[in-house]
Amino acid sequence: GYSINSRTAFQYLSDHQGIDQDFSPRSIYFARQDMKQKMFSEELNIKSTTPGRYKWLFGAFGFWQGIDNTVTLDYFTKDYATRKLYDTPAYGVAFYHQSTIDDLLTRGLSLTFGIRYDYEHTSNDFLFYKETDGGSEQMDAFDSRLKFSQVTPKIALQYMFPSTGMLYATVTKGYKTGGFNTSFDREEDRTFRPETSWNYEFGAKHPFLDNRLNAEFC
């Protein structure tokens, strides 16, 4: 048999900040940031429920996110203000699978293998205005797009002792996608790169005092 699970989520954020940028008793610079963020996500997976040595799981994940950010900087001593508008929508999908084989070669030893594929597309529509009593002047503008994809594997070994306790070892690849910063001053700070890591974990778990104390070493 099998079971199907679904998880749907929606997030909404409305943030307003006012910051005294000159940090002095005088009114010289004052920054205002207004940001609205909306995100919708859906995850669906199906996994085996039939008793046996082999267990499997397949899943898919998708999301859409929209961020609208406006940063206004008032220059009181110069009688003008700057206004930066950042429109940063993004969407992504992921597909994953995991298989586990129990009692591999010997009773109590299990092997788990997993793999995941991620794809994400993000864009940034940026407008920069200088505002005075005489009106508004556009100083800069761009519309950029970025695409990212990555495959991340996982492998784990676990041995359950006949009495109590277990040993385990896990190797996984971690991934964090790149994208656009929600605000920036320099051109080189407009985007950030993806990050990857390899993670290794070795450990043991064992109960003591008739299961009243559990110890874990890793």
What positions do the PLM features span?
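Membrane-embedded beta-barrel scaffold of Gram-negative outer-membrane proteins
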Residues: 3-22, 160, 165-176, 191-218
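Outer-envelope beta-barrel architecture signal
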Residues: 2-4, 44, 52-56, 107-111, ...
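Residue-level signature of outer-membrane beta-barrel architecture
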Residues: 38, 46-49, 99-103, 149, ...
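Outer-membrane beta-barrel domain signature, strongest for Gram-negative TonB-dependent receptors
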Residues: 1-57, 63-65, 214
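Flexible, surface-exposed loop regions and adjacent strand-edge segments
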Residues: 11, 20-29, 72-81, 127-137, ...
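Outer-membrane beta-barrel proteins
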Residues: 1, 19, 25-41, 83-90, ...
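Transmembrane beta-barrel architecture of outer-membrane proteins
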Residues: 1, 35-45, 90-96, 110, ...
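Signature of Gram-negative outer-membrane beta-barrel scaffolds
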Residues: 57, 62-162
